[in-house]
Curated annotation (Swiss-Prot):
It is found in: Cytoplasm. The gene is arcC1. Its main location: cytoplasm. One of its GO terms (molecular function) is carbamate kinase activity. Keywords: Arginine metabolism, ATP-binding, Cytoplasm, Kinase, Nucleotide-binding, Transferase. NCBIfam families: arcC, PRK12352.1. Signal peptide: none annotated. It catalyses: hydrogencarbonate + NH4(+) + ATP = carbamoyl phosphate + ADP + H2O + H(+). This is Carbamate kinase 1. Pathway: Metabolic intermediate metabolism; carbamoyl phosphate degradation; CO(2) and NH(3) from carbamoyl phosphate: step 1/1. InterPro entries: AceGlu_kinase-like_sf, Asp/Glu/Uridylate_kinase, Carb_kinase. GO terms for biological process: arginine deiminase pathway.
């Protein structure tokens, strides 16, 4: 039996609550399949599109005197509940359909970051909707948001993405796992908080990369494998070119060389690769699987996906 952290990509979860729910239902079947095979899993998820949409909607309401403005940390908490609820419901229904009595819990999770992290001066995490260049330039002019081109898919707003230091609710996660509970935690990389005097915490405007927090979680609970589910079936080098090549198996040294060659897009594939390297360096016997949400079953059979080992 293996202990596995499964990290679901926010971009792979669809563009609307309805689309997300359908995708989550299908994913639940694959995740429950892991459980029926005897594996112990913990689930994390991204929230880039979702938290951006929540923040955009609330800001629009505030600008039109229809409600208060909400800080980004609170928007992150809302996205954890929204995505976690749909995952939780789908998993509960799937478990019930096969007669398995197992509790599923979504845990609102805070993650400590350093307020002096250089990421706060260099926003890099894409969030929210995709725009064409003209739309992005107009919004940037009106609101002062920073936009970047995102892996050939359009322009998106970017926000700071500091490194995760510690998971505040880690001991609660461990307790739930010990009590045979299926845990959904660290959604969106966790709600970013900074440590204040007397060990208090305060939310800060940022979005932590969910794969980096998932790698930290995996190391902290000593899991055997980290599965990163995204929108593409393999990790590629020379991505979106005539020489595009999938990586079926690779290792840490090879990936570091590809990073030096700028093979992985900042804000999309690069943090996934950095998370994979971090996980394996902290857990040399572990492995990482990166593939698409829709190909999880095939990937678990070794038919698709990128496998990374030491």
């Amino acid at each position: 039996m293996a202990k596995i952290v499964v990290a679901l990509g926010g971009n792979a979860l669809g563009k609307s609550p309805q689309e997300q729910l359908e995708l989550v239902k299908n994913t639940a079947k694959s995740l429950v399949g892991l459980i029926t095979k005897g594996h112990e899993i913990v689930i994390s998820h991204g929230n880039g599109p979702q938290v951006g949409s929540i923040n955009l909607g609330l800001n629009y309401a505030a600008e039109h005197n229809q409600g208060p403005a909400f800080p980004f940390a609170e928007c992150g908490a809302m996205s954890q509940a929204y995505i976690g609820y749909q995952l939780q419901e789908s998993l509960q229904n799937e478990l019930h359909s096969i007669g398995m009595n197992k509790q599923v819990v979504t845990l609102v999770t805070q993650v400590e970051v350093d307020e002096n992290d250089p990421a706060f001066n260099n926003p890099s995490k894409p969030i929210g909707l995709f725009y064409n260049k003209e739309e992005a330039e107009q919004i940037q002019k009106e609101k002062g948001f920073i936009f970047v081109e995102d892996a050939g898919r359009g322009y998106r707003r970017v926000v700071p993405s500091p490194q995760p230091i510690s998971i505040i609710e880690l001991e609660s996660i461990k307790t739930l796992i010990k009590n045979d509970t299926l845990v959904i935690a660290a959604g969106g990389g966790g709600i970013p908080v900074i440590r204040e005097q007397h060990d208090g915490f305060k939310g800060i405007d940022a979005v932590i990369d969910k794969d980096k927090t998932s790698a930290l979680l995996g190391a902290n609970i000593q899991c055997d494998q980290l599965i990163i589910l995204t929108a593409i079936d393999y990790v590629y080098i020379n991505f979106n070119t005539e020489n595009q090549q999938p990586l079926k198996t690779t290792n840490v040294d090879e990936l570091k060389r590809y990073i030096d060659e700028n093979q992985f897009a900042k804000g999309s594939m690069l943090p996934k690769i950095e998370a994979a390297i971090s996980f394996i360096e902290n857990n040399p016997k572990g492995s990482v699987l990166i593939t698409s949400l829709n190909e999880l079953d095939a990937a678990l059979e070794g038919k698709v996906g990128t496998v990374i080992k030491k």
